[in-house]
Amino acid sequence: MAEENAKPRIGYIHLSGCTGDAMSLTENYDILAELLTNMVDIVYGQTLVDLWEMPEMDLALVEGSVCLQDEHSLHELKELREKAKLVCAFGSCAATGCFTRYSRGGQQAQPSHESFVPIADLIDVDLAIPGCPPSPEIIAKAVVALLNNDMEYLQPMLDLAGYTEACGCDLQTKVVNQGLCTGCGTCAMACQTRALDMTNGRPELNSDRCIKCGICYVQCPRSWWPEEQIKKELGL
């Protein structure tokens, strides 16, 4: 990914998000110490590095959806695509828009900002790590997989780069209604807002709690495993 014997250069770009993804990256140093200290160089980030001009980088982690009324964000997004070898939609706001997609404007302190979309609607995205926020463990594993060129581990994240809409309803329409649900409960355990409960071995959605992050669908093993792999794992 980078020149031989050189640390991969990583940049962090913050758009329309709550900074929760950055906190997951920087405030879990006990988990990420080896990664952040010895394995990569953080070369850009508004709150991480004292640097005004965006440099060339191997990987850009983008937090937050992009506001179509914010010219600075639109320019920054275009620039990072030109300067980064790989772009990662980091967190659900960047990957799927999360609840920011449903903004109608009028909010303080930027009432004119009313249209928010996932970054893949505007630029090519190489991989996505959803979550609100992503766990520090998955951050570390994803970056290490990139360093080791472990494409098998990264394949679901590569596939998710083109999946820009998400809702707990996806479990019903794409898993349960297709006869694929095994009742494992992984989706309910993954939901960070407790919008999902398991009832009679099937997920039941409380739409008032759902923030459209998509992590429940992503964590469901039936959402991305090919049929041949499912049969192999189950011995069928």
Curated annotation (Swiss-Prot):
Positions bound to [4Fe-4S] cluster 2: C191, C210, C213, C216
Organism domain of life: Archaea
Molecular function in Gene Ontology: 4 iron, 4 sulfur cluster binding; coenzyme F420 hydrogenase activity; flavin adenine dinucleotide binding; nickel cation binding
One Pfam family linked to the record: Oxidored_q6
Record's keyword terms, sorted: 4Fe-4S, Electron transport, Iron, Iron-sulfur, Metal-binding, Oxidoreductase, Repeat, Transport
Enzyme Commission number, as recorded: 1.12.98.1
Cofactor(s) demanded: Ni(2+); iron-sulfur cluster; FAD
Entry keyword annotation includes Transmembrane: no
Enzyme superclass (EC): oxidoreductase
Domain 4Fe-4S ferredoxin-type: 172-200, 201-230
Catalytic activity from the UniProt record: oxidized coenzyme F420-(gamma-L-Glu)(n) + H2 + H(+) = reduced coenzyme F420-(gamma-L-Glu)(n)
PROSITE patterns assigned to the protein according to its UniProt record, in alphabetical order: 4FE4S_FER_1 (PS00198), 4FE4S_FER_2 (PS51379)
Cofactor binding summary note: There are 12-13 Fe atoms per alpha/beta/gamma unit of the FRH.
Cystine bridges: none
Binding site for [4Fe-4S] cluster 1: C181, C184, C187, C220
Glycoprotein recorded as keyword: no
Family note: Belongs to the FrhG family.
Record PANTHER family: COENZYME F420-REDUCING HYDROGENASE, GAMMA SUBUNIT, F420-NON-REDUCING HYDROGENASE VHU SUBUNIT G
Protein's job: Reduces the physiological low-potential two-electron acceptor coenzyme F420, and the artificial one-electron acceptor methylviologen.
Quaternary organization: Heterocomplex of the form (alpha(1)beta(1)gamma(1))(8).
Protein name, UniProt field: Coenzyme F420 hydrogenase subunit gamma
Organism: Methanothermobacter thermautotrophicus (strain ATCC 29096 / DSM 1053 / JCM 10044 / NBRC 100330 / Delta H)
